[in-house]
Amino acid sequence: MSSKLTNITERFDFEGTICEIKPLGEGLINDTYKVKTAETDKPDYVLQRINHHIFPNIEMVMHNIDAVTSHIRNSLAANETPYIDRRVLRFLPTKNDGKLYTMMDDGTYWRLMIYIDNAITKQNIDPENSREAGRAIGNFQKMLADIPVALGETIKNFHNMEFRLEQLYDVVKQDPIGRVKEER
């Protein structure tokens, strides 16, 4: 177990005793690790290095994430939705300043969240997964329709649905790998 990763994790206000830290998933942007705790009544965690080359304004990224997750969590609670902790990420504050991220001496940024057991990431794209992803994006947009705070733009046009739809329509027109032709 890496003492560096343990030291980073210990900056956060978490419960339990760290017994293992190992890579998690196949992410392309951030480095992600599962932090396992020794106690069965304590959660496991996800430790993630935020790629500050992709997201140079870490403060804004974490403000957005906090605003979005808090709003969705509150909306689900108001509707008495079950299993909220399985539906919404929960980030932990640091011990020293209460921020939802920490910056290390080497200039890297890290965050810690509760691990959602048995969550899966689909690696293959098929029509059923695409429909489910579309439904999920639609539900996400619907849940944020009444968010009371402004979100900052961390990547130009990243959350601009009109721009994303135009990109989709352009790709459908171009059909670069022949999928549209196959479906007709």
Q: Residue ranges of each PLM-predicted region?
A:
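Broad hydrophobic/π-residue packing in well-ordered secondary structure
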Residues: 11-15, 33, 108-116, 159-165
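Conserved structural core of kinase catalytic domains
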Residues: 90-132
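ATP-dependent phospho-/nucleotidyl transfer catalytic cores
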Residues: 22-26, 48-59, 116-131, 135, ...
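Short amphipathic C-terminal alpha-helix that caps PH/PH-like domains
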Residues: 65, 133-140
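Protein kinase-like catalytic domain
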Residues: 73, 141-148
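Conserved NTP-binding catalytic cores of kinases and kinase-like/nucleotidyltransferase enzymes
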Residues: 1-100, 104-107
